[in-house]
Amino acid sequence: MEYLQKYIRQNIKIFACNSDKTPATPKGFYNASVDQEIVEKQFHDPEKMLIGMPTGNGNNIVVIDIDVGKPMENDHGEKILDSSGNEIIDPRTVNEILDELKELGPIPNTCQVETPSGGRHLYFKVPFTKINSGRRYFDKTLPIDIRANGGYVIVPDGKSDYIVYDD
């Protein structure tokens, strides 16, 4: 419950998610709240639940989500297969992907969180955004998603293996 309180104190809306990262609330991220009573009811089994945070205008936060070790895709979003028909796993590290992203323009210093799968979330505070969640903002060969309006991310909860880099 300590991490729940941390987000509530920072006025960050949160909601309960199941261990498979799916929402544990009837309306998903639309049930996110900073009301302690509402949040505590959602987290009826906090040891088994993850903390979801709406992105976009719900919290005025946009997240760049970098995945590693995923199947590679071409610029049409189709998985790339080897000669045997098996998916080719992207060998790039987070830092290599960040370097490719920087070629598109500078990345401001921001809070970064290494996810349990080895990926990275880059958090950006925004006053208002018209950006929607999706992949269409980047070269589709980069394993990067934007989490904004219509999306959410799982945030550090003190139980999972997250590493926070706060520049």
For each feature predicted by the language model, list its residue ranges:
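Histidine-centered active-site/metal-ligand motif
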Residues: H121
